């Protein structure tokens, strides 16, 4: 109930705030329109007075016919062009036959309008005198003073009002632009993940289980196209079909392994990731491993140099782990042992676990022990035996230590300790004694499975 009540309060606050903003907007918009109306009328009056005073009369008529306004200070009301104005000849004021235009309103109405305008002007003058500088009031002297920190309201993007010529038309157009901008801003934001769009219509769905002829079509498309979108869809389709044993054989027999593996060289990380995933599913088959072994060194190099903890690196580590389950191709990766241990220390949680699984595959082969324990490793690797790590990491590092310790005994490497440097894995695990102290400290771990594993390792020392 507490969360429901909080949500209701938040919704009510948003509604009240929106209503207040709308009221302020309506009030300020009407104020601006009212000011523009009076400003336009004042400008027309001043322009007419200047033109009449500056130009002589010719033949009893002024060059520009003067408009007279009924009442003192009264402005002419705006009318449509379709309405004709009444013209009347008034007695000789400035000269004979001076033609003046008057509106067909009554004198009483004009007098009221003049009084209202005079009152409005006096109120504006009083307000400006009280307010002082820096605050915007209706246009009195045609110069609008603004504070340096406040934008001029009513303009576009916080700017000042547009010019007077065609001001109403531009206000209408600017209103339309603002409404369009608001409608565009209401659209849902773009997704965080990049979505590729290709012009090519792929003939199959990525989760379709295809027959051999259909797989051949997909391989042909993958071999001929250079479009990243088409390559990605084809690789995902082949990878999903490679999860089934009957399609693993079909893809190999159709010559699909070299077609897929050629995309390892591409620079697109998404394409490389999908390539590794497809080869990873194919590598479950031992016959396919014989085809993939040609590219295993290239996969290893790319996995080590690509961005740390990236999806490409994880896909490459999974492929290398599958390829080293058996002992047939482990020797092809022995040169990368220092890189694996560096990655074990630098990587995040998931990278550490996947790297441990890969190294454990090597530790289960006694023939790889000498090369494994002689490689240089960072001394910070000992921190993986701390209690702060979760169960999975602790169980993997304990298994790694257990296998290496067993292999050192079985291979008789304990007597040849002089062959190994102080920065080697042999010295860190066997000679320093720090590792054994860390393992003994784990005997008091709160996890029962970790405790059992620690006791098993300690009994073999």
UniProtKB/Swiss-Prot annotation:
Region (Disordered): 34-110, 148-192
Compositional bias annotation for Basic and acidic residues: 96-110
GO biological process: hematopoietic stem cell homeostasis
Topology in the lipid bilayer: Single-pass membrane protein
Keyword ATP-binding in annotation: no
The UniProt record lists the keyword Plastid: no
Listed transmembrane segments: 7-29
One Pfam family of this chain: Arm_2
Protein purpose: Regulates mitochondrial transport during axon regeneration. Increases the proportion of motile mitochondria by recruiting stationary mitochondria into the motile pool. Enhances mitochondria movement and neurite growth in both adult axons and embryonic neurons. Promotes neuronal survival and axon regeneration after nerve injury. May link mitochondria to the Trak1-kinesin motor complex via its interaction with MIRO1.
UniProt family annotation: Belongs to the eutherian X-chromosome-specific Armcx family.
Name used for this protein in its record: Armadillo repeat-containing X-linked protein 1
Gene: Armcx1
